[in-house]
């Protein structure tokens, strides 16, 4: 996102999971939303509607939200201004980094293979485009970082 170098760092979380390629596939498709994330992602995002845009080895994956039809009146050249209000993107940078931008927080994740062949360590970093206004605002951001970690770690 434009100006990301000026964003505020919220913190990081570490997640231990399965083989990194298996875990990375979760960013590539939404078919697992209904089964793996029935309480968090599935209520707002379709499990079977995705769009892929390749940029060399990198991918932009779009997921349609259940509010997508509200974008019908938006001019096509202005749709980019409505991210997270009708659709979400995961930006995948080869070989193992993903970025998810949401109004509440932005997550930058890096999956690192190992220590064994059936394991990975995912380090997630959280950013926000504006500094927190107060302690409560900072606490809400920390809570969102914890929630995003829990979606992956506990809802699998």
What is each PLM-predicted segment?
Residues 1-156:
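C-terminal catalytic domain of Rieske-type non-heme iron oxygenases
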């Amino acid at each position: 996102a434009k100006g990301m170098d000026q964003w505020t760092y919220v913190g990081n979380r570490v997640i231990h999971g399965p083989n990194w390629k298996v875990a990375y596939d979760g960013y590539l498709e939404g078919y697992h939303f209904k089964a793996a994330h029935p309480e968090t992602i599935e209520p707002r995002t379709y499990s079977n509607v995705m769009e892929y845009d390749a940029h060399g080895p990198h991918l932009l994956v779009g997921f349609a939200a259940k509010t997508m039809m509200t974008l019908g009146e938006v001019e096509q050249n202005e749709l980019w201004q409505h991210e997270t209000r009708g659709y979400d993107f995961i930006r995948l940078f080869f070989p193992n980094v993903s970025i998810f931008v949401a109004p509440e927080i932005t997550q930058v994740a890096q999956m690192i293979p190992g220590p064994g062949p059936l394991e990975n360590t995912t380090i997630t970093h959280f950013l926000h485009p504006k500094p927190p206004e107060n302690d409560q605002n900072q606490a809400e951001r920390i809570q969102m970082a914890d929630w995003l970690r829990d979606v992956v770690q506990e809802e699998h």
